[in-house]
Structure formats: C-alpha cells, structure tokens
C-alpha cells in the first residue's frame, strides 16, 4: 500500500542521558511526549563508522544529510584514505604508481606538503607516514617534506612534538623535513596573496630562516612568542629541498578549502604582480579534488558519485517532491541530501525561508521555525507532493551557542512546529518519519557544568507516525531512512541503497 511520505529532520535533536545536560528532556515538550506515547519509535546511530566517519567521531549535518538521502553509508574522505593506508591498497592506486614511477625513472625529487598535525580536520600524519614508506619502497632518495604547522585544530605549541615524531619516522623510512611554515601563510583561504607568497617563496625559492635542527628551530620560534599557526618560514640548511621544474608534489591535505590557493599559484595561474609563477612540468597530486576548475593536476582519491539518492529515485518515478528549510540548513536538505548535487531533480520544488539576521541565535532561539512551519503546512494542504523533507534548524544552531535558556526556548518552538506540521500531514493522509541528523541540544553541559557547544555522540530518535496500530520501527542508522521512506511510498529501494527497512 502506498502513501505520501513526510520526512522531518530535527537538527541537533539527539536522545540524551535525561540528566541536567539534556535540555530536550528537561524542557516541557507536550507534543513530543504525545508522539512518544502514541507512535512506534526507535533509535538511529548518527556518528562514527555508522555514517562513514572514523570510530568515535561525532556526526555533523553535512554527513548526516548525505547518509539520510543516500540510503547507504557514505564513507568520508578520511575513512577512505585510512582504509587504503591500512590495507595497503594505496600501493595499487594508479595515481600513486604514476607519481613514484615517474620520479624514479626521471631522477626527480618527490615533495610531500600539508598540515603536519594530528588535528584530523585537514590532514592525517598517518597518511604522511605512509607516503614516506612508499618513497622508501621505490628507493627515492630525494624525498622532501614541507610541514605546515597547525595550532588551530591542535594546541598552539604541539607542533614541535609533531616535528619530532615525523623526524623519528623519517629515520627508519624515507624523507627529510625541508621546510616549516605556519598554516596562517600556507593555508590561507581568503585570497590574502601576500600570506601565500611567504609559503611560495619558501617552497620554490628557499627563502626563510636557515636551521640545521628543525626541532630546535620550532623551540626558538616558541621562545620568540610565535606559535604553530604563525611560524615564520624555516629552511633546512642541510639540504636543498626547493620545488623545481618537473618535480613531483603531493599535497596530502584531504580537505579542500585551505589547499586551493597554494595549488593555484604553483600550478594554475601566474601572479607576476605578486612575484609568483607556476612551475613548468610539475607533476602535482592532490589528495582529493580541491576544485573542479583545476587543470592538469592529479587526484589520488576522487569524489565518490552518490547515484540513486532518495530524491533522484523519487524523481525517476515521475513523483513530486518538496525540500524545505531555513537558510542555515537549506544546503543540507538540497545539496547534501541529493548526494552533492546542486541542481534540483525533475518535479522537485524547493522552499528557502531566510534565517533571522542576528549575530548569534541565542538572540532569537525560535529562528525562522514558525515561518518554515507555516509554508510547510500550506504545501501539505495543497496535496501536490508525494514526498516532503523538512529540516528544523533550532536544536543545532541554538545548541551551538551553549546558552541553556536559549536552547530551552528553541526546543519549545520546535515542539510547537512539529505539532502543527504533523497534524496537517495526518489530515492529508501522509505518513511521517521524524528523525535527527545528529545530537546537540541533548547535551548542553559538560561534566564540570560548563556549556558544551559541540555535537553529541548520542543516538537520535526515529518516530513513525502512522495510522497502523500494529506498526513497529526497529533501531538502525541514518542510512536506513531512505529505504524506509520508499517502503512507506510503496516503492522498492534501488540496488544502490543497502540500508535496511526499519518499519514492520
């Protein structure tokens, strides 16, 4: 039997420990309580390996909506590369083979550059160590490492320890630390080309403070009051590790935003006014796709094409769908939900409600929830859509402020909106699944009572609003939502979706 389906995503609405830190539990939510008492519900895992992230890593809205829409676990870049390093399949990666074979056959140097820290946001030391090992295996003596120091995703003076770790690994593997510079210069993303020039001059022209002991040079920088992020260019005086014509460069950052500008000046665009010119014949490898417009660069781990998402599949059946959210979460119910696709599918309507223009959302905890609700109720009453997905942003966006009283107000607003939407949906014969993409408002305090502004690792709810009194809903993970929606709609899930159907 086929029904129209409504998928409601309450952003940041996890299932907490029901103690003081759990604002959702501690705030009066009469309609949520009614749903819990009258409809089948279960828990979904929304973090770590269940959503394609490393074990123990909290989920986020981008990853959450990607998994929800895909109907399968979508492995994130970090996990894909970790796996390739662990099972040695990286050795068969055709781009790795081409890079190291070319260097060996042509007597060229190999350069690894990237953020040298264990912050886990832009790069991984594990990947760098593996690259050193591959260089050793190919017998490439001229292997140079250019270290961009962190201090943002790590402690501001942790960099010296990372340089020590890397030096120790190079002793038994391959590679020499040729240069060091702070990410402030090497990883700018705001077109401050004068900063990028500092990194360019270091890498290409060997301009910087000469040092024979790179660990000692880090300590000297600290002694001068300059911490990791802002480390001025340091050159290893014991070797010439500058990047030359025809060399191999592997930029081992897997996150793209702060890897673009340096890539531009080395490979894409001459900037004579800034004294920066691209290097002829450079064999340049990016860990992941940094920018679709880049020409002549190699990509070690290409973007996974997520085909047959929930939105695409519903469109292929000639059905009508609506995606609605306020600005803060609009990209999540469109671009991410549709597998990283910007353009709407056939018969896919979108409603964007502007988020309020306030400095921080504790100043307006209800955000634009009531406006989203009003537009959604109107759309439901049009009786035009076979499938609707909506996101209410409050639990997450107000949760990030860490201000308890504001989060309480956000929860109250969401509860009121859920009521109006679900009652309208029931009246128009929709069945609804209510979930969250990850937790946040369910853990507003740390153990010591200080505000917690981060996402939680808690599971999230899955409520099945149906007229079928015998219905049950099983525990699962976010990847199980799309096949479950299709079941409600009387459609068989495509083979690409390996998530489980949760309703029985």
Curated annotation (Swiss-Prot):
Matching InterPro entries: Alkaline_phosphatase_core_sf, BPG-indep_PGM_N, Metalloenzyme, PGAM_B_sf, Pgm_bpd_ind
Binding site for Mn(2+) 2: 11, 61, 437-438
Catalysed reactions, semicolon-separated: (2R)-2-phosphoglycerate = (2R)-3-phosphoglycerate
Positions with a binding annotation for substrate: 122, 152-153, 183, 189, 255-258, 329
UniProt-recorded Gene Ontology molecular function terms: manganese ion binding; phosphoglycerate mutase activity
Pfam families xref list: iPGM_N, Metalloenzyme
Binding site for Mn(2+) 1: 396, 400, 455
Cellular component annotations (GO), alphabetically ordered: cytosol
Keywords: Glycolysis, Isomerase, Manganese, Metal-binding
Requisite cofactors: Mn(2+)
Pathway it works in: Carbohydrate degradation; glycolysis; pyruvate from D-glyceraldehyde 3-phosphate: step 3/5
One of the GO biological process terms: carbohydrate metabolic process
Disulfide bond annotation, renumbered to this chain: none
Domain of life: Bacteria
EC number: 5.4.2.12
Cofactor info, note text: Binds 2 manganese ions per subunit.
Class of this enzyme: isomerase
Active site per the UniProt annotation: 61
HAMAP family assigned: GpmI
Reported function: Catalyzes the interconversion of 2-phosphoglycerate and 3-phosphoglycerate.
NCBIfam families registered for this protein in UniProt: pgm_bpd_ind
Summary of subunit composition and partner proteins: Monomer.
Record family assignment: Belongs to the BPG-independent phosphoglycerate mutase family.
Protein's name according to its UniProt entry: 2,3-bisphosphoglycerate-independent phosphoglycerate mutase
UniProt source species: Bacteroides thetaiotaomicron (strain ATCC 29148 / DSM 2079 / JCM 5827 / CCUG 10774 / NCTC 10582 / VPI-5482 / E50)
Origin organism lineage: Bacteria, Pseudomonadati, Bacteroidota, Bacteroidia, Bacteroidales
Gene symbol of the encoding locus: gpmI
């Amino acid at each position: 039997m086929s029904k129209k389906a409504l998928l409601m995503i309450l952003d940041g609405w996890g299932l907490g420990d029901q103690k003081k830190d759990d604002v959702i539990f501690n705030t009066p939510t009469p309609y949520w309580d009614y749903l819990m008492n009258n409809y089948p519900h279960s828990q979904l895992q929304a973090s770590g390996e269940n959503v394609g992230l490393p074990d123990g890593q909290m989920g986020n809205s981008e990853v959450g909506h990607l998994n929800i829409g895909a109907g399968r676990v979508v492995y994130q870049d970090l996990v894909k590369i970790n796996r390739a390093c662990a099972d040695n399949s990286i050795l068969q990666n055709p781009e790795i083979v081409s890079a190291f074979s070319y260097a060996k056959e042509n007597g060229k140097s190999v350069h690894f550059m990237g953020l040298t820290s264990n912050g886990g946001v832009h790069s991984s030391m594990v990947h760098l160590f593996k690259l050193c090992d591959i260089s050793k295996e190919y017998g490439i003596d001229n292997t140079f490492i250019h270290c961009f120091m962190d201090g943002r995703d790590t402690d501001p003076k942790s960099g010296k320890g990372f340089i020590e770790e890397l030096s120790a690994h190079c002793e038994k593997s391959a590679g020499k630390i040729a240069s060091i510079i702070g990410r402030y210069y090497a990883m700018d993303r705001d077109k401050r080309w004068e900063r990028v020039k500092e990194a360019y001059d270091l890498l290409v022209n060997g301009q910087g403070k000469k040092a024979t002991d790179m660990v000692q040079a880090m300590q000297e920088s600290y002694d001068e009051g300059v911490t990791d992020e802002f480390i001025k260019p340091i050159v290893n005086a014991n070797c010439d590790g500058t990047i030359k014509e025809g060399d191999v460069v592997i930029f081992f950052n897997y996150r793209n935003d702060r890897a673009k500008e340096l890539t531009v000046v080395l490979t894409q665009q001459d900037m004579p006014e800034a004294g920066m010119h691209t290097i002829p014949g450079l064999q340049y490898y990016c860990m992941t796709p940094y920018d679709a417009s880049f020409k002549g660069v190699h990509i070690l781990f290409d973007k996974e094409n997520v085909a047959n998402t929930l939105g695409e599949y519903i469109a292929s059946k000639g059905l009508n769908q609506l995606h609605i959210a306020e600005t803060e979460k609009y990209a999540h119910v469109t671009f991410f939900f549709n597998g990283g696709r910007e353009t709407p599918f056939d018969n896919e309507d979108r409603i964007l409600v502007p988020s309020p223009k306030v400095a921080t959302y504790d100043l307006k905890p209800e955000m634009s929830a009531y406006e989203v609700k009003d537009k959604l109720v109107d759309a439901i009453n049009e009786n035009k859509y076979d499938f609707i997905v909506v996101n209410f942003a409050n639990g997450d966006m107000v949760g990030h402020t860490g201000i308890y009283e504001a989060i309480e107000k956000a929860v109250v607003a969401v509860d009121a909106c859920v009521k109006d939407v679900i009652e309208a949906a029931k009246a128009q014969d929709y069945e609804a699944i209510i979930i969250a993409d990850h937790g946040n408002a369910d853990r507003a305090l740390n153990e010591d009572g200080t505000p917690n502004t981060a996402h939680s690792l808690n599971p999230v709810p899955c409520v099945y609003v149906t007229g079928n009194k015998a219905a049950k809903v099983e525990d699962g993970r976010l990847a199980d939502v799309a096949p479950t929606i299709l079941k409600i709609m009387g459609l068989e899930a495509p083979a690409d979706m390996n998530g489980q159907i949760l309703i029985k």
